[in-house]
Amino acid sequence: MLPIVKRDSLLNGLQIIILEQPGSGRVSTHLRIGSGAMYDLAGKGGLANVTSKMLLRGSSGLAPAGLANLTEETGLSVEITTGWDSTDLKVSGPASELETILDLIGRLVISPTFDQKELDSFKSSLISELKEASPRDKETVRQAAIQSIYGSHPYGRPLQGTAESLTAITRPDLTYYHNRFYLANVSQLVIAGDATLDQVTKLARSKLGPWKKGDRVPATFRPPEPVGSRRLLLINRSDTEMGTAAIAQIGYSRRAADYYAAAVLTELLRETAKAPGATVEIEANPRVLAGPLVINVSSPQDRIAAVVEAILDEVGRIQGGSIPPEKVEAAKARLVSQMAERLHDKDETAEVILEIELYELGRDYLLNFATRVNAVTTADLQKAAQAYLKPQSVAIAVAATEEKVKESLKKLGPVSVMK
């Protein structure tokens, strides 16, 4: 059953979307601002993330201690996250506090103070966390592979930045990012719960009407340099019997015309790209621009090269057109089922609606989702496989003991050792 969605907008372009749940006694608000880490300034990776987190460290008439007191007194929960394409502020609480919630959202996004002492303290804590984190975990391997294929493109850097890039971020950088990208007309506010559209629109005019609008910044980045052959990076580690690998390549955009075929193809890979005794996870990251397609692998060190080779062979078979029809139908069914499950959860329903807006998927997206998935043909999958699967030009990062795996990895291509 599709959700009943009610809409309105403010003069500044802010879209208001309501999922009414009368009698629930609670409201969940989700504000999505249509810009994220993709727009970090050069050499200042992590700027979008720092900017968003600093909203909670002081705004007009609300110091950090005041925010803590407010949430405790009213029973509100506040969460802010930064992605590559968006910044998301979520505030939930009793329906009786709806005006307080919208007032808080307005204060946070319209007039943050970016206090210098708070910024210095926050940057210091982030840098300490990065330096104390294990350099050999799954994320390090994943990031090494992604950086290898994207190079200087924004997607090649860590979303949260590095110690060096965080050190370079200044208060004027935050002010610039906020002024340039925190715009009402590239944002949507979804409210699910015990509130009506008229009630929300009236309060939003008062609390969020002053939020400025501006020109949307296009994502006109130079594409990454093509990868001509496999790149193998070995991160030497000696304290474990398990090996970790990430196989990365440039995937597809969420706005791609062949998105449905690409999504079915990814689901098909999740079923077929497996190896005995190994953990294999396939991660697609469709974004405004083509995001990374990553296969994460964990296995005993003495088998890591063989497992990676087996996975690449399977990717090659699918790229070559060896696509089992029965597995295709199962992959389609899983995608349709996953969407149905998302729509049974109010928070996930809000997320789906925001994806529709952010990626301009069309108001008929949910109505036609199952039909479009099921319409994907074997020929469509073969075209998508040719477009998106490149087993001979992937980046492979492996964390394992050099003397145990280097020779076996050489069968896959030239190996560069990262000390």
Positions of predicted regions on the chain:
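M16/insulysin-pitrilysin zinc metalloprotease superfamily fold
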Residues: R57-G61, S92-K123, N285-R342, V417-M418
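An aromatic/glycine/proline-enriched structural segment found at the starts
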Residues: G151, Y155, L159, Q188-S253, ...
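M16/MPP (pitrilysin/insulinase) zinc-metallopeptidase core fold and M16-derived inactive scaffolds
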Residues: S28-A95, P135, R157-P158, L269-T279
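Buried hydrophobic packing residues in well-ordered domains
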Residues: G13, L31, N49-T51, T71, ...
